Design a protein with these regions (language model features):
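Intrinsically disordered, low-complexity Ser/Thr/Pro/Gly-rich regulatory segments
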Residues: 1-134
Length: 134
């Protein structure tokens, strides 16, 4: 930024007054108890990063809007939401430390219908959805 403030933000999505601030994590595999734990630890750390980045964005919102060529309106109450974008499906759809962890399918599905089935069973050649991410 012109002010000299800086932060590496992996994902910024703006929809009206709603702004998602994301930390992206590339996690290769979770094939053992140890790698499962490491994945959770990585994602837990990513939630802290996402929150820090959302705070940075909030503290520098006018300058960031100017940098992106967006019109900043001080009368609008912008809602900033930290999110962790996970390349691996594990933990996607569930929050860690109150921050949603999503993969590309959950994110795409959210914008198409705002719900995503998480738990489904197949009976009589039909899927019955038992749990959703909303």
């Amino acid at each position: 930024l012109k002010s000299g403030a800086e932060e590496e933000i992996d994902l910024i999505l703006k929809f009206g007054n709603v702004i998602l601030i994301g930390e992206a994590k590339s996690i290769v595999t979770t094939d053992s108890s140890i790698s499962y734990y490491r994945t959770y630890s990585t994602l837990k750390g990513a939630t802290d990063q996402a929150r820090r980045k959302a705070l940075f964005f909030s503290s520098n919102i006018e300058e960031i809007f100017e940098t992106f060529g967006w019109t900043y309106d001080p009368s609008i109450s912008y809602q900033l939401f930290p999110v962790v974008l996970n390349s691996n499906k594990i933990h996607s759809g569930f929050p860690i430390n109150g921050v949603p962890v999503v993969d590309e399918q959950v994110l795409a599905r959210y914008f198409s219908s705002s719900t995503f089935s998480l738990i489904s069973v197949k009976r009589d050649d039909k899927f019955h959805h038992l749990g959703w991410f909303k």
